[in-house]
From Swiss-Prot:
It comes from Mycolicibacterium paratuberculosis (strain ATCC BAA-968 / K-10) (Mycobacterium paratuberculosis). This is Peptide methionine sulfoxide reductase MsrA. GO terms for molecular function: L-methionine:thioredoxin-disulfide S-oxidoreductase activity; peptide-methionine (S)-S-oxide reductase activity. The keyword Disulfide bond does not apply. It is an enzyme of class 1 (oxidoreductase). Keywords: Oxidoreductase. The active site is at residue 13. SUPFAM superfamilies: Peptide methionine sulfoxide reductase (SSF55068). One of its GO terms (biological process) is protein modification process. Belongs to the MsrA Met sulfoxide reductase family. The keyword Ion transport does not apply. It catalyses: L-methionyl-[protein] + [thioredoxin]-disulfide + H2O = L-methionyl-(S)-S-oxide-[protein] + [thioredoxin]-dithiol; [thioredoxin]-disulfide + L-methionine + H2O = L-methionine (S)-S-oxide + [thioredoxin]-dithiol. InterPro entries: Met_Sox_Rdtase_MsrA_dom, Met_Sox_Rdtase_MsrA_sf. The lineage of its organism: Bacteria, Bacillati, Actinomycetota, Actinomycetes, Mycobacteriales.
């Protein structure tokens, strides 16, 4: 398989995000890191305004960007600014880092569907920004919940959660 694509998502602590996303059909690999901020060569101890994020490599013959985003919106709360569960601060914000104009279009369309669906109680605060440098997190953060299955996470699959497409005029 040579045709893969990349998605970069932030939705709180990267341990739980990575653990759930890695299990999705079509996901080839994941790695956690820091992106969307101001510090070069970011680390856990010095990541400035970067978000904890997951870089996802996927096979577009098996899954697509929209499906990945729908799952992303199912496993984290996109209506809380700079917070997921007990974690607070800009590192834990909800963000989509797009790699091209098509990803940006799909991200904005998916957010509009989330807003229209009423599946979340508040307004979606997920940032949509161009992808920049992605600083890979230290080895102890990679695959964390694989090594510590009872480790901390605030992410979970919501049973029965299915994102409908909103009705749009003219389509």
């Amino acid at each position: 398989m040579t045709n893969t694509q990349k998605a970069i998502l932030a939705g709180g602590c990267f341990w739980g995000m990575q653990e759930l996303i890695r299990k999705q059909p079509g996901v080839v690999s994941t790695r956690v890191g820091y992106t969307g901020g101001d510090v070069p060569n970011a680390t856990y101890r010095n990541h400035g305004t970067h978000a904890e994020a997951v870089e996802i490599i996927y096979d577009p013959a098996v899954t697509d960007y929209r499906q990945i985003l729908e799952f992303f919106f199912q496993i984290h709360d996109p209506t809380t600014k700079d917070r997921q569960g007990n974690d607070r601060g800009p590192s834990y914000r909800s963000a989509i880092f797009y790699t091209d104009d098509e990803q940006k279009r799909i991200a904005l369309d998916t957010i509009a569907d989330v807003e229209a669906s009423g599946l979340w109680p508040g307004k979606v605060v997920t940032e949509v920004s161009p992808a920049g440098d992605f600083w890979e997190a230290e080895p102890e953060h990679q695959d964390y919940l694989q090594r510590y299955p009872n480790g901390y996470t605030c992410h979970y699959i919501r049973p029965g959660w299915k994102l409908p497409r909103r009705a749009t005029s003219g389509s």
